[in-house]
Amino acid sequence: SEKPQQELEECQNVCRMKRWSTEMVHRCEKKCEEKFERQQR
């Protein structure tokens, strides 16, 4: 079975690859976390 944690890390990696400000990347990572938290319920 696919591990949500791995998908979360991939999502966050995409955020980091973008040439955004640190704040924007952080916001993007947070959205990933929120998305995967909802999926697990």
Swiss-Prot record:
Gene Ontology MF, one: serine-type endopeptidase inhibitor activity
GO biological process: negative regulation of peptidase activity
Disulfide-bond pairs as recorded: C11-C32, C15-C28
Keywords, comma-separated and alphabetical: Disulfide bond, Protease inhibitor, Serine protease inhibitor
Gene3D superfamilies registered for this protein in UniProt: 6.10.250.1700
Superkingdom as given in the UniProt entry: Eukaryota
Role summary: Inhibits bovine trypsin with a Ki of 0.174 nM and trypsin-like proteases from G.mellonella larvae. Has no activity against serine proteases chymotrypsin, subtilisin and elastase. Has no activity against cysteine proteases from beetle gut.
Name of the featured protein: Trypsin inhibitor 2c
Organism: Fagopyrum esculentum
Lineage: Eukaryota, Viridiplantae, Streptophyta, Embryophyta, Tracheophyta
